[in-house]
């Protein structure tokens, strides 16, 4: 495939054109009075949204160079959304201003590398200032406010605050689609994993199709159990103790399964067999978690433990085990709190080390099952389109609320950036083009507030000057057009969202300014199909 190459100013300008087209479509959605954007779908009704990432994802430009420019800014929005669940439009607006002002200076003869260094130094200083002015989230109301702003719905904010209240900071909150209208919150006590009973004959409550064991022993085995002779010694000991038995193993099959089922049907002995969750190393880790939680040990040939030699001391205990067709819940495991805390710290250390988003998500889930709990928010809506958009918004709001708890909150509405800039630039000592880079950042910090004001039908420049003259923490409530104490009025952003937006925007701006060539694929001209043969035209 042939390639095209553009150099220097022509390359940078082409990238900028692509970026501007995407940014102009996204920035109209910023703020409480943000406008909507209609997205055409190949099939079905068009989607109407004011979510920055959804709009950015839909934009595909025809010109190859412009397309690359737009893709770079999409990356800013996506990265900010992944990290903090919000701030995508803010990041796009910041990136557009940084690039526009930066390219203007490069065209005037400034050194791109010096500008980049200046932008990076100023960004770092502003991020420090943001974290200094951030306030810790102390009340449930503050979490609700933050989540409400992200989701654009106070009911959603309240529900997320309630979920976080119940499952704690380490807990996992998932969002699922529901068949009914409205919102539902479902809380899980204890550890739950997605594996159900191996045979429906284990069911103790036929109405709810559940197997419920009170105060059971729990056998945790990282192996298949098929021979009954391996299982008999354990069964006899548990029967003598007069307790039921829950078996969590790689698989239970053959005569071992038949023996358990027959004894259950006869009423001789209550038990339930469940396949272990996960695969490979992840299964091993999750069985280890269950063992720590219940105070048992994983029975495995690797550690020299054979099934036939297992005593009651190697089995776990719990107040209750509830098993349905699809999932198992262990309530109040009898594990040693110190060992559980040690395991939690070990998982936390793994989370910090990992580079993979998927691994991080799975580790977070394991952490929640051990330390916190799991809450499920079920979302319903009238149409498929509305359901998808609503679910996406609520997922963002959950990440947003978690970000607020992590790094604290700052005044929303573009005010925090403006005020962090005030203190940050006093301490900066740069010269030449590096100082110009810092001034570009100073200019960019006004952009989000300006855009919020413009979207609300106000004069951006006038609003920025007015907010500059107000005391710290005060700004424009674009919903009412009044100037208020932002945090008291509940107009807040997580510091992590604002920080991520600026860092990601500055990172892309640096790439734009230091680009000297762009290589793109040459668009192929569509070949006209050959005309069909006309025969001999003999009539």
Swiss-Prot record:
Any one GO BP annotation for this protein: protein refolding
Location of this chain's protein in the cell: Cytoplasm
UniProt keyword list: ATP-binding, Chaperone, Cytoplasm, Isomerase, Nucleotide-binding
GO MF annotation terms: ATP binding; ATP-dependent protein folding chaperone; isomerase activity; unfolded protein binding
CC terms in the record's Gene Ontology section: cytoplasm
Enzyme Commission (EC) number: 5.6.1.7
Binding annotation for ATP: 29-32, 86-90, 413, 493
Highest rank taxon of the organism: Bacteria
InterPro entries: Chaperonin_Cpn60_CS (IPR018370), Cpn60/GroEL (IPR001844), Cpn60/GroEL/TCP-1 (IPR002423), GroEL-like_apical_dom_sf (IPR027409), GROEL-like_equatorial_sf (IPR027413), TCP-1-like_intermed_sf (IPR027410)
Gene3D superfamilies in alphabetical order: GroEL (3.50.7.10), GroEL-like equatorial domain (1.10.560.10), TCP-1-like chaperonin intermediate domain (3.30.260.10)
Reaction(s) this enzyme catalyzes, per UniProt: ATP + H2O + a folded polypeptide = ADP + phosphate + an unfolded polypeptide
One matching Pfam family: Cpn60_TCP1
Similarity comment: family membership: Belongs to the chaperonin (HSP60) family.
Its biological purpose: Together with its co-chaperonin GroES, plays an essential role in assisting protein folding. The GroEL-GroES system forms a nano-cage that allows encapsulation of the non-native substrate proteins and provides a physical environment optimized to promote and accelerate protein folding.
Subunit relationships: Forms a cylinder of 14 subunits composed of two heptameric rings stacked back-to-back. Interacts with the co-chaperonin GroES.
PANTHER family the record matches: 60 KDA HEAT SHOCK PROTEIN, MITOCHONDRIAL (PTHR45633)
Protein name: Chaperonin GroEL 1
Organism: Acidothermus cellulolyticus (strain ATCC 43068 / DSM 8971 / 11B)
Top-level taxonomy: Bacteria, Bacillati, Actinomycetota, Actinomycetes, Acidothermales
């Amino acid at each position: 495939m042939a390639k095209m190459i553009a150099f220097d100013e022509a390359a940078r300008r082409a990238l900028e054109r692509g970026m501007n087209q995407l940014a102009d479509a996204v920035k109209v959605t910023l703020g409480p009075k943000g406008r909507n954007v209609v997205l055409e779908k190949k099939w079905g009704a068009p989607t109407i949204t004011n979510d920055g990432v959804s709009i950015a994802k839909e934009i595909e430009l025809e010109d190859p160079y412009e397309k690359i420019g737009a893709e770079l800014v999409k990356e800013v929005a996506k990265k900010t959304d992944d990290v903090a669940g919000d701030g995508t439009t803010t990041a796009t607006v910041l990136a557009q201003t940084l690039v526009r002002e930066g390219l203007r200076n490069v065209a005037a003869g400034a050194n791109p590398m010096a500008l980049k260094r200046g932008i990076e130094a100023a960004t770092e200083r502003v991020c420090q200032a943001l974290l200094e002015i951030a306030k810790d989230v102390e009340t449930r109301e503050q979490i609700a406010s933050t989540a409400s702003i992200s989701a654009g719905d106070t009911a959603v904010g309240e529900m997320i605050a309630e979920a976080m209240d119940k499952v704690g900071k380490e807990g996992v909150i998932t969002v699922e689609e529901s068949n009914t209208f409205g919102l539902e919150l479902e809380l899980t006590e204890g550890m739950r994993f997605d594996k159900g009973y191996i045979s429906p004959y284990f069911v103790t409550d036929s109405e709810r199709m559940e197997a419920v064991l009170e105060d059971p022993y729990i056998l945790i085995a990282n192996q298949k159990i098929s021979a009954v002779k391996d299982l008999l010694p354990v069964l006899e000991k548990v029967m003598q103790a007069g307790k039921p038995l829950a078996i969590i193993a790689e698989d239970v099959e053959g005569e071992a399964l038949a023996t358990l089922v027959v004894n259950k049907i006869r009423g001789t002995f209550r038990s339930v067999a469940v396949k272990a969750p996960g695969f490979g190393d992840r299964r091993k880790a999750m069985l280890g978690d269950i063992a720590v939680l219940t105070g048992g040990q994983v029975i495995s040939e690797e550690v020299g433990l054979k099934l036939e030699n297992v005593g009651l001391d190697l089995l776990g205990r719990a107040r209750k085990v509830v098993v349905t067709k699809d999932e198992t819940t262990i309530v109040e495991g009898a594990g040693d709190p110190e060992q559980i805390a040690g395991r939690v710290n070990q998982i936390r250390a793994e989370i910090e080390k990992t580079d993979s988003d998927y691994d991080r998500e799975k580790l977070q889930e394991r952490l929640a099952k051990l330390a916190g709990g799991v809450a499920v928010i079920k979302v319903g809506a009238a149409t498929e389109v509305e359901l998808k958009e609503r679910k996406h918004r609520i997922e963002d709001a959950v990440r947003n609320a978690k970000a607020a708890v992590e790094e604290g909150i700052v005044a929303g509405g573009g005010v925090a950036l403006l005020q962090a800039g005030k203190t940050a630039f006093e301490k900066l000592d740069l010269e030449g083009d590096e100082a110009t880079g810092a001034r570009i950042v100073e200019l960019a910090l006004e952009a989000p507030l300006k855009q919020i004001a413009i979207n609300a039908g106000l004069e951006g420049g006038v609003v920025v000057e007015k907010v500059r003259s107000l005391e710290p923490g005060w700004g424009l409530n674009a919903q009412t057009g009044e100037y208020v104490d932002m945090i008291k009025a509940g107009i807040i952003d997580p510091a992590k969202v604002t920080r991520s937006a600026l860092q990601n925007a500055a990172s892309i701006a640096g790439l734009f300014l230091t680009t000297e060539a762009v290589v793109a694929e040459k668009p192929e001209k569509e070949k006209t199909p050959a005309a069909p043969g006309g025969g001999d035209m003999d009539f």
